[in-house]
A protein has these predicted regions:
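Glycine-rich active-site loops that engage anionic ligands at enzyme catalytic sites
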Residues: 1-88, 93-243
Length: 243
């Protein structure tokens, strides 16, 4: 297991690096620590920002200096102890979700060009995309935007050289070896290959409920639906955990 490195990013924040590879093992370490720190009733932590392999901790510099002249050293010591506890906690439980996607040309703006670039038929691209189970590594870019991987090398492709001014909510795209879903209408540079009718972000839900359907650590599998199924989709009665 890679040694932990901790480095300051400002007077009142530091980043913990738990690995340098995009994989579930490292990502699990990040979110075990993230969940552990979130559960603590600790006035020192002002914000926790998880990513693929890192966790950035923003802390109350005034409170920290009551304990030590070097806030960075004091916080680092506390976090190293927390990491040791978390590394003994085992694998994080994950949810399995099934998400419908319509890969018709009116939704998959870049499906034809991607298939041509990869010397594959459109059906082959769809089969490769739906064959894989993807891990949600993190949320970012937009509220509830899931960064998922890892995409089959045969359909992995760089971002568009010129981003679109508008990508509709629900659009499913590929960028590099990752796939993602746009939760809102937004500009974007991912290669759009389809669209899900499922609303994955709802800012108007109860404060006791996650506004984002997908959470880090979830496992996602896509399945293909027709245009008719897309337009008749029943959001209210659909459960992605049992689809």
């Amino acid at each position: 297991m890679k040694a932990v490195s901790i480095y300051p990013v400002s007077e009142s924040a530091l980043t913990i690096c738990l690995g340098n590879e995009l994989n579930a093992v490292v990502n699990d370490r990040v979110f075990r620590l993230y969940n552990h720190l979130r559960k603590q009733v600790n006035p020192f932590w002002k914000d926790l920002i998880p990513a693929y392999c890192t966790l950035t901790v923003v802390y109350d510099i005034k409170e920290m200096r009551k304990h030590s002249q070097s806030a960075f050293k004091w916080v680092s010591k506390q976090l190293k102890e927390a990491i040791d506890q978390c590394d003994d906690a085992g694998i994080l439980p994950s949810r399995q979700l099934s998400i419908p996607v319509c890969y018709e040309s009116e939704f998959g703006f870049d499906l034809k060009s991607l298939s041509k670039a990869k010397k594959l038929s459109i059906d082959q691209v769809i089969k490769l995309h739906t064959a894989q189970t993807y891990r949600v590594f993190m949320l970012g870019f937009l509220p509830g935007f899931p960064y998922m991987g890892i995409v089959n090398d045969k359909i992995a492709t760089p971002r568009l050289s010129s981003p679109r001014k508008l990508v509709p909510a629900g659009s499913v795209g590929i960028a590099g070896n990752q796939t993602g879903i746009y939760p809102l209408d937004s500009p974007g540079g991912w290669n759009i290959i389809g669209r899900t009718p499922l609303q994955i972000f709802n800012p108007r839900v109860s404060v006791l409920t996650d506004t984002s359907l997908l959470q880090p650590g979830d496992e996602v599998k896509f399945y293909s639906i027709t245009k008719e199924e897309f337009h008749s989709f029943d959001q209210e009665n659909f459960n992605p955990l049992s689809a």
